[in-house]
């Protein structure tokens, strides 16, 4: 009897570890992998906006973004698929003190994440960022935000090419 209890406790104790080992193996966790790599980011006129490094971390559960303009601005994001809610999440922080929380998922072949910030004046701004993989291996990032009248405007349009 005692051995049976010990065996049951041992199996129960190992179950979370076994579950955690395969926690991010589902195909949904790979939906944003097209963004992985070392990138040069250019504006539509071809000027270098910055560089971006996207790595897979924490056993493939997290995409870690490190963006730099090479000047006074840089930022990082953590991206993950929340399997419980079936949604992608991004937390962005940068040298301007900004915090941007986005959520969404695949729309066709593009990753579309949306969120909202509130300015010091209490004005809410909606954000929508779309990453679209291209057949040549590049990725377009189109960031839109709403103006004071609620109209969508392009905040950033960048083309990612592998370094």
Would you name each region that the model predicts?
Residues 20-163:
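Hydrophobic small-molecule pocket/channel-lining residues, especially in calycin-type beta-barrels
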Residues 7-16:
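Bacterial N-terminal signal peptides
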Residues 1-4:
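Positively charged n-region of N-terminal signal peptides that target proteins for export
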